[in-house]
Amino acid sequence: MAAPGPNKDNIRAGCKRCGYPGHLTFECRNFLRVDPRKDIVLDVSSTSTEESDEEEQEALSKEKIFGSHSKGSQEDSRKEKHKKKSKERSRGKAKKRSYSSSDEEEDEMSKKKKKRKSNKKKGKKEKREKERKHKKKQKKKDTESSSSDSSSESSDTD
């Protein structure tokens, strides 16, 4: 006998507005509030973006002909325009993001490779210089020690 109320087995976290489990209610972008004081909500996901401005004008002219100038029809037309604008904005943002992110990643990778190559070259140069300096110091020590040895030998023979 399962209880009809919510329990841990049948609760699924998701959006209460559109029912999609991929996001929570406060993250929902499928519905827009037209007026925060009223409880009017727009469903963005149901609008089609393929309608042109001409089709909108035809629909408005038909409404004028039939004489349906109630507040509801005006609000509906406003809502549709608002939906289309918001959808166009979101589509434009998505295109920019996808375009720029891939290019930036490629640029970053090439920059990193260049930095690594330059760092390797610098490291090799520094090693060579250190080896040269070390060899010079050893030669000086050898020459100093040999000259001191020869001077001591010459003093012994005199």
From Swiss-Prot:
Q: Which terms does the record give in the GO molecular function aspect?
A: nucleic acid binding; zinc ion binding
- Low complexity bias: start-end ranges: 145-158
Q: Where are the zinc fingers (CCHC-type)?
A: 13-30
| InterPro entries reported for this sequence | Znf_CCHC
Q: What is this protein called?
A: Protein SREK1IP1
Q: Which organism is it from?
A: Danio rerio (Zebrafish)
UniProt keyword list: Metal-binding, mRNA processing, mRNA splicing, Zinc, Zinc-finger
What function does the entry list? Possible splicing regulator involved in the control of cellular survival.
**Basic and acidic residues bias locations:** 59-79
Q: Does the keyword Phosphoprotein apply?
A: no
